[in-house]
Amino acid sequence: MVTQNKKILIITGSFGNGHLQVTNSVVNQLNEMNLKHLSVIEHDLFMEAHPILTSICKKYYINSFKYFRNSYKQFYYSRPEDVNKCFYKYYGLNKLINLLIKEKPDLILLTFPTPVMSVLTEQFNMNIPIATVMTDYRLHKNWVTPHSSRYYVATPDLKQEFVNVGVPEDIIKITGIPISEQFDEDIDTKVWMHKNHLDPNRPTILMSAGAFGVSKGFDVMISDILERSPETQIVMICGRNKELKRALRQQFKEYANVLILGYTHHMNEWMASSHLMVTKPGGITISEALARKIPMIFLDPAPGQELENAHYFQSKGMGKIADTTEEAIQLITELTQDENALAHMAEQMQDLKVKYPTYKLCRDLLHLLDHSSQFEEIYGKVPMYAKLFIK
């Protein structure tokens, strides 16, 4: 496998950490395979092509979940023909062409929805195979690139969605979403809980404050959960929000069943050791939770990929949507007092769990690479109005 020099170009994006995490998982897996004839390069296309404008767009994207939900909803659910007429389709085109001419890759791997790639495949002459890693659980039009060689998806349902829009069934592989291999490794959860001075036999709620991007309301939420379900224990991950961590630690310092943490490298251990997780339905987070079979409550998911992921997991019995904090507290109370309900949700997750997704994806990727042809020059034309946006 890969007996002659080959190069993979990974196109990613830094709109949220999920796409970068997928990229890192793939790169790390390929490195572990010790392929002497393979080189892998990665580029954040939009940031490199238009750093100032992309930075502004990233801030808008992050704030859209809190302040501009309706405008993001309108963009996400816009019709395909609306996107085709939009400059966004040509965003980063010139940078992408220059990258291909400079690097001469044997294969392009997309870990971020990149509509500009469709411009290359439809309006330019190009013989480079393109593979796409879908990082969510429902299809969005921006993930579809005409004349692609491969799509890697999370579930049979998502594969069928691609087939329904005309993608050939034989180029869609169900590999799961690439995550770290550690989420498939065995963990002694009793040892982990004792190490952190918690009771492994009590229902444990894992809450990730960093996923919500807000600092208020968690003190009341924790207090209400403990009042209604005093037998539970809570692990709160505050991420890099030092002020929130300090405030919560001060408020709950006398509670042996509340653990307040900052940024942690041990989400794997906490997911494996907890019984229920309150989080936002980002593609990577819920894939890690799926691997650990920890049921989830999705608190106020934003319109777009978050809400679509949440609806999918709820439809499969693996999670529940709470539109308000009060709804979330009520669901937590009901589930922590019903072991059978939690166990049933975990069983449902077993049916969709794919072990070692990154390894499976990389094995197929290398097979695809073996059949790639030699790089040829790229040429073509784009509409005149698009030339304003392709630098």
UniProtKB/Swiss-Prot annotation:
Family matches, as Gene3D superfamilies: Glycogen Phosphorylase B
GO aspect biological process, one term: enterobacterial common antigen biosynthetic process
Domain of life: Bacteria
Keywords for this protein: Carbohydrate metabolism, Cell membrane, Glycosyltransferase, Lipid biosynthesis, Lipid metabolism, Membrane, Transferase
SUPFAM superfamilies the record matches: UDP-Glycosyltransferase/glycogen phosphorylase
Catalytic reactions of this protein: a 1,2-diacyl-3-O-(beta-D-glucopyranosyl)-sn-glycerol + UDP-alpha-D-glucose = a 1,2-diacyl-3-O-(beta-D-Glc-(1->6)-beta-D-Glc)-sn-glycerol + UDP + H(+); a 1,2-diacyl-sn-glycerol + UDP-alpha-D-glucose = a 1,2-diacyl-3-O-(beta-D-glucopyranosyl)-sn-glycerol + UDP + H(+)
GO cellular component: plasma membrane
Pathway per the UniProt entry: Glycolipid metabolism; diglucosyl-diacylglycerol biosynthesis
Subcellular location: Cell membrane
InterPro entries: Diacylglyc_glucosyltr_N, Glyco_trans_28_C, Glycosyltransf_28_UgtP, Pro_diacylglycrl_glcsylTrfase
EC top class named in words: transferase
Record protein name field: Processive diacylglycerol beta-glucosyltransferase
Organism encoding this protein: Staphylococcus carnosus (strain TM300)
